[in-house]
Amino acid sequence: MDVGNKSTMSEFVLLGLSNSWELQMFFFMVFSLLYVATMVGNSLIVITVIVDPHLHSPMYFLLTNLSIIDMSLASFATPKMITDYLTGHKTISFDGCLTQIFFLHLFTGTEIILLMAMSFDRYIAICKPLHYASVISPQVCVALVVASWIMGVMHSMSQVIFALTLPFCGPYEVDSFFCDLPVVFQLACVDTYVLGLFMISTSGIIALSCFIVLFNSYVIVLVTVKHHSSRGSSKALSTCTAHFIVVFLFFGPCIFIYMWPLSSFLTDKILSVFYTIFTPTLNPIIYTLRNQEVKIAMRKLKNRFLNFNKAMPS
């Protein structure tokens, strides 16, 4: 964006999900509860994995990083939306809008690569178990996580740099509860067809391609598991099922929004709520409900906490 344009446009108005006061109060309560649940649930996973030595394995190291990303993804816009519903203040500065775009694509891009790393971990564990220790070493796990963040930063920087080149001519109303390129593009004084192609090529195709790779890897894993009836295979099937549910819930909305960036705003708003608020809340539930090791570790952590409180002098 040129300097003259930026000086005349200093903020956007976030229209949110509804203009109805009753619905806004409803959203305020629901999203407040979901946000607290997201932070508590994912924090419990992180603390449990750190405290319990039985969970010091590559799979749970990656799961811990997924929980950290989910907490970050839920925090880049949800707290502002909650306070906006309470105060009625719905504006965001131009720099604040760019910041939201940056962090949204940073966390989603990082999560996409991390989910692929988790899929690779399960593929090696189930399809090539004899090579697991040598292939998925602690160094490899750290490298996968670092690579995820680096690729997330590169992707988000490309989105922000492109947004900086856009001229805006008003009205400066973002038809969503946070800034993202599909809705911000609608305010630009340029051909939206070209902008749509940019979104599809830099986000939509990447998300779709990664989902196809993940889907194929889980199909291979499930076919491998089908030929075994051991308890270990049953455990592997349960873990992979949980992973795939997470992948589907996260990728589905992203693919729709970025493969069809000029689609209905109402549909986009609903899907945006899903992958920025609901999915980070559901991930801890999905993993703990289908994972006996995590549930046992959490019970131990709870008992240690209760015993510590009993031992404290009154």
Curated annotation (Swiss-Prot):
One Pfam family recorded for the sequence: 7tm_4
Glycosylation sites: 5
Keywords carried by this UniProt record: Cell membrane, Disulfide bond, G-protein coupled receptor, Glycoprotein, Membrane, Olfaction, Receptor, Sensory transduction, Transducer, Transmembrane, Transmembrane helix
Main localization of the protein described in the UniProt heading: membrane
GO MF assignments: G protein-coupled receptor activity; olfactory receptor activity
Superkingdom of origin organism: Eukaryota
Cytoplasmic side of membrane: 50-57, 121-139, 220-235, 290-314
GO cellular component annotations of the record: plasma membrane
UniProt key word Disulfide bond: yes
InterPro entries xrefs: GPCR_Rhodpsn (IPR000276), GPCR_Rhodpsn_7TM (IPR017452), Olfact_rcpt (IPR000725), Olfactory_Receptors (IPR050427)
Topology in the lipid bilayer: Multi-pass membrane protein
Coiled coil: none
Cystines in this chain: 97-189
Tagged with keyword Hydrolase: no
Location relative to the cell: Cell membrane
Function: Odorant receptor.
Protein family per UniProt: Belongs to the G-protein coupled receptor 1 family.
Name this polypeptide is given: Olfactory receptor 4K2
Organism expressing this protein natively: Homo sapiens (Human)
UniProt gene name: OR4K2
